[in-house]
Amino acid sequence: MSLDMKEHPDAEVQKNQVLTLEDWKEKWVTRHISFHQEQGHQLLKKHLDTFLKGQSGLRVFFPLCGKAIEMKWFADRGHTVVGVEISEIGIREFFAEQNLSYTEEPLAEIAGAKVFKSSSGSISLYCCSIFDLPRANIGKFDRIWDRGALVAINPGDHDRYADIILSLLRKEFQYLVAVLSYDPTKHAGPPFYVPSAELKRLFGTKCSMQCLEEVDALEERHKAWGLDYLFEKLYLLTEK
C-alpha cells in the first residue's frame, strides 16, 4: 500500500464508539494493556532532540500516561513530568517498575482522585479522568507527549480533549502527537483512527502542524483485528 493512500474515506464510521472509564480500568485489571511499550516509543527516541530543542528544566505533560517509561527519561534529563491516568494500577506499576519511591494523597478539588508524586518531586501523576483534571489547576506546559491518548479518547470527546490540551500549552510550546492510520471499517477501535484532517480541525486554528515521520506499524496482533495496513504518524504541533 502506498503511503499516499493513508486517509480513509470512512473516517466517520467510528464516531459513536464509546469506552467508559470503567472499561479502561478493567483493561489494567485483566492485563489487556498491549498498548504499553516496554522499550518506550522509538519515534520519540529518534526525534527527541527536535522535541526538546536542547532546553532544560521543561514542564512535560503526559495525557493518559499509563506506566510509560518515557516519563522517567524526561525526569532523568532534569525535566518536570506531570501525567494523568485513570488506572491506579498503572500508576503504581510505573513507580514500582522504575524503582521510584513516591507519596500519594487525595486531591481536594476532585472527589475520589489522588495525586502520586515521586520522592524527588520531578514526577506527579494524577489518578483521575483527564476531563476532570482542569479543576486541579496543574499549570501550563512547555511540552506535551501524546502517544496513546488522542487515539484512545472516544471520537465524540475529541473537541473537549483538544480544548484541555490547548489550555495547558505555554507560549513556544511543542506538542508531539502520534496517531494511527488504518481502515476504520475493519476495526472499531480503540485505538481509534485519527486522520490528519481531524488533527487540523482540532488544533489547526492555534497550531502549525508538521508530520515528522510515518512508519509502517502493522504487527501480528493488528492482523488479528482484521487490518491489512496500519501506519503510525508522528506530528509536531507548534505555536502559530
Curated annotation (Swiss-Prot):
The modification N6-acetyllysine is found at residue 53. One of its GO terms (biological process) is methylation. The modification Phosphoserine is found at residue 34. The keyword Phosphoprotein applies. It is an enzyme of class 2 (transferase). Its EC number is 2.1.1.67. Substrate binds at residue 35. Keywords: Acetylation, Cytoplasm, Methyltransferase, Phosphoprotein, S-adenosyl-L-methionine, Transferase. InterPro entries: SAM-dependent_MTases_sf (IPR029063), Thiopurine_S-MeTrfase (IPR025835), TPMT (IPR008854). It catalyses: S-adenosyl-L-methionine + a thiopurine = S-adenosyl-L-homocysteine + a thiopurine S-methylether; mercaptopurine + S-adenosyl-L-methionine = 6-methylthiopurine + S-adenosyl-L-homocysteine + H(+). Its main location: cytoplasm. GO terms for molecular function: thiopurine S-methyltransferase activity. It is found in: Cytoplasm. S-adenosyl-L-methionine binds at residues 24-35, 64, 85, 129-130, 147. Changing residue 69 to V: In strain: C57BL/6J. Pfam families: TPMT (PF05724). One of its GO terms (cellular component) is cytoplasm. Belongs to the class I-like SAM-binding methyltransferase superfamily. TPMT family. HAMAP family: Thiopur_methtran. Monomer. This is Thiopurine S-methyltransferase. It comes from Mus musculus (Mouse). The gene is Tpmt.
